[in-house]
């Protein structure tokens, strides 16, 4: 289904662009399979500074920008009645991830007292949405750091013409190629997902959680042409190409980075708070998508 054209490293910015050729398995009799779409896939910005990412997107000139969640940090405990236990009931946070985060929080607090560490500034998510939407049409799904959207978020999204897919799908056309794009949220709606899978045409699913692949898509035999996920942050620490830990899959996650059948998992374009990466650069994923040869 996919082949990788080695990542283009940006040594100064420490951000890479990973490239994949994607062949959609289902032919469309109404579309020439010679038509190739250039899709930018972004995941896990976490409200961080988007300037490096925006420079790459402008250079790549994609036909669409697809974002699979955690663009914004909207997970304040108690806001609009949301609680940690509520959101955790939808996802399976592993014991090892919880212990790992608690240890790092303690170390980070100590280092801050000695001026060795500091909290990274956030609040850049809306800047990214505003500027990236001028590069190409954007489709956005919801991740586990987006329990809610603020009124100013919604106003900007509407003004910029960004399509938010919160357990929803839509029909669009790119370069004469009809596509359905859907977004499965952390607070998942399985009835919608099953209905979406039955629809005709080529279907892309933005699904922040790669662990939902086995939990829902494989379990219920659902059919999608392409699934785009993030969340695992590439396994956080990667040795010999193997991710070590992810929030939803625990130790040695099965889906952490790369191509798994019809699913592409991004290592993400940023980090969550202070968690370091080793052997696991942040990445923008560029997809060259076309139909099967006849």
What are these regions (language model features)?
Residues 1-38, 43-46, 51-52:
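Acidic, histidine-bearing metal-coordination/catalytic regions of metal-dependent phosphoesterases
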Residues 51-173:
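Core catalytic region of metal-dependent phosphoesterases/phosphodiesterases
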Residues 59-60, 129-135, 196-199, 218-223:
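Short, conserved loop/helix-junction motifs that constitute active-site signature segments
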Residues 151, 155-162, 168, 174-220, ...:
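Binuclear metal-dependent hydrolase catalytic cores centered on His/Asp/Glu-rich metal-binding motifs
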Residues 15, 23-40, 162-163, 170-182, ...:
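Beta-strand-turn-beta hairpins that frame and shape the catalytic cleft
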Residues 40-43, 64-70, 113, 137-144, ...:
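Active-site neighborhood of phospho(di)ester-bond hydrolases with catalytic His/Asp-centered motifs
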Residues 139, 211-294:
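Conserved beta-sheet core of the metallophosphoesterase superfamily
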Residues 47, 72-73, 211, 234:
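Short active-site segment of divalent metal-dependent hydrolases/proteases
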């Amino acid at each position: 289904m996919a082949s990788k054209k080695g990542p283009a490293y940006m040594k100064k910015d420490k951000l890479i662009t990973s490239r994949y050729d994607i062949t959609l398995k289902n032919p469309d009799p109404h579309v020439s399979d010679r038509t190739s779409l250039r899709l930018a896939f972004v995941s896990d910005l976490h409200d961080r500074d988007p300037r490096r990412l925006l420079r790459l997107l402008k250079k790549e000139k994609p036909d669409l920008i697809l974002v699979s969640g955690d663009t914004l940090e909207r997970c304040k405990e108690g806001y609009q009645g949301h609680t940690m236990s509520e959101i955790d009931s939808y996802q399976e946070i592993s014991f090892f991830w919880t212990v790992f985060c608690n240890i790092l929080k303690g170390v980070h607090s100590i280092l801050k007292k000695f001026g060795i560490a500091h909290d990274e500034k956030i609040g850049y998510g809306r800047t990214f949405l505003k500027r990236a939407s001028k590069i190409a049409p954007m489709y956005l799904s919801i991740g586990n750091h987006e329990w809610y959207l603020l009124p100013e978020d919604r106003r900007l999204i509407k003004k910029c013409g960004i399509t938010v897919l919160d357990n929803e799908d839509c029909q669009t056309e790119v370069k004469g190629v009809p596509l359905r794009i859907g977004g499965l949220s952390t607070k998942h709606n399985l009835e919608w997902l099953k209905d979406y899978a039955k629809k005709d045409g080529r279907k892309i699913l933005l699904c922040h959680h790669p662990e939902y692949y086995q939990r829902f898509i494989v379990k219920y035999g659902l059919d999608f042409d392409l699934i785009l996920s993030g969340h695992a942050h590439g396994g956080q620490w990667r040795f010999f190409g193997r991710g070590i830990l992810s929030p939803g899959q625990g130790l040695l996650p099965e889906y952490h980075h790369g191509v798994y059948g019809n699913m592409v998992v991004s290592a993400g374009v940023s980090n969550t708070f202070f968690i370091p990466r080793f052997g696991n650069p942040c990445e923008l994923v560029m997809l060259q998508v076309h139909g099967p040869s006849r």
